[in-house]
C-alpha cells in the first residue's frame, strides 16, 4: 500500500505569514525584533517551542519552563486571532486532497499544534480526508528530526519507503528523507534552490497527481 503525507503550513494552508505575525508580536512584547526574512532563513523549520527557545538563546536569554509556556500560549492566542480573519487554505488544496485521497490514504505531519490543524480542516470540510494527523504536540522531537513522519507512516500502517511527503521547506524535506520517504517540494515558501533535496519540485498542488506519486515510489522521479 502507498500513502501520501502532507506538511500543513505552506503546503495545504497559507499560514506561514500568520505564524510569523503571531510570533513577531509575541516577541515584540518582550522587547525583541524578528524580521520575516530572518524567520524564513533560520526559524521556519522549528515548531513553536523550538523556535522561541532558539530565538531567546540567540538573544542571550535562557527561558525557564514557566516563561516559555507563557510565551507559547501568547503566540497560540495571537495566531488564533489572525486565523479568525478568514479562510487560509490554498485554492489548490481541496482538489489535491480529493484527487490523492481517492487513490491513497492520507496523513499530515506538521510542526503546528494538532488542534490548530484540525480546526482549519474542519472549517473547510476536509478533516475526514485524513486518516492521521501528527502535530507538534504529538512528538518529542520536531522537524528536521524524522519523528513526525515516522509516526504518521506508522499511523497509516505503511512503511516510510511506501509514502511520499509534500513539503515546503528544507527542514521538512530533511525530516521526511530522514524517515525514508520520497519527497515533493513545493515552492510556496522557498524557490527551487532551497528545495534541492526534494525528489521532485512543483509550484502548485495542481501539479501533484496520483500518477506522479506512483512514479516517485517506483523510483522514476
Positions of PLM-derived features:
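An amphipathic alpha-helix signature
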Residues: 20, 24, 48-53, 72, ...
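Active-site neighborhood of HAD-like aspartate-dependent phosphohydrolases
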Residues: 1-41
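Anion (oxyanion) recognition and catalysis
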Residues: 28, 100-101, 177
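Asp-based, Mg2+/Mn2+-dependent phosphohydrolase catalytic module
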Residues: 1-2, 113-221
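Short, acidic loop-to-helix structural element flanking the phosphoryl-transfer center
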Residues: 81-108, 114, 118
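Helix N-cap/coil-helix junction residues
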Residues: 32-34, 61, 126, 157-158
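Helix-loop "lid/cap" segments that line or gate small-molecule binding pockets
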Residues: 26-27, 47-63, 120, 153
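Metal-dependent phosphoesterase signature
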Residues: 57-95
Amino acid at each position: 500500500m502507498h500513502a501520501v503525507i502532507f506538511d500543513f503550513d505552506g503546503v495545504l494552508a497559507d499560514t506561514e505569514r500568520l505564524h510569523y505575525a503571531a510570533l513577531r508580536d509575541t516577541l515584540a512584547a518582550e522587547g525583541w525584533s524578528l524580521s520575516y526574512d530572518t524567520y524564513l532563513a533560520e526559524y521556519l523549520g522549528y515548531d513553536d517551542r523550538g523556535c522561541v527557545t532558539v530565538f531567546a538563546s540567540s538573544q542571550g536569554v535562557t527561558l525557564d519552563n514557566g516563561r516559555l509556556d507563557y510565551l507559547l500560549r501568547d503566540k497560540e492566542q495571537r495566531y488564533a486571532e489572525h486565523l479568525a480573519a478568514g479562510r487560509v487554505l490554498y485554492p489548490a488544496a481541496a482538489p489535491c486532497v480529493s484527487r490523492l485521497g481517492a487513490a491513497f490514504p492520507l496523513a499530515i505531519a506538521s510542526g503546528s499544534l494538532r488542534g490548530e490543524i484540525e480546526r482549519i480542516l474542519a472549517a473547510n470540510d476536509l478533516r475526514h480526508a485524513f486518516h492521521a494527523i501528527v502535530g507538534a504536540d504529538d512528538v518529542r522531537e520536531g522537524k528536521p528530526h524524522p519523528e513526525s513522519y515516522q509516526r504518521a507512516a506508522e499511523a497509516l500502517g505503511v512503511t516510510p519507503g511506501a509514502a511520499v511527503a509534500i513539503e515546503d521547506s528544507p527542514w521538512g524535506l530533511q525530516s521526511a528523507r530522514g524517515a525514508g520517504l520520497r519527497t515533493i517540494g513545493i515552492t510556496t515558501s522557498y524557490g527551487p534552490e532551497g528545495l534541492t533535496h526534494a525528489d521532485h519540485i512543483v509550484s502548485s498542488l495542481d501539479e501533484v497527481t496520483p500518477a506522479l506519486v506512483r512514479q516517485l515510489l517506483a523510483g522514476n522521479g
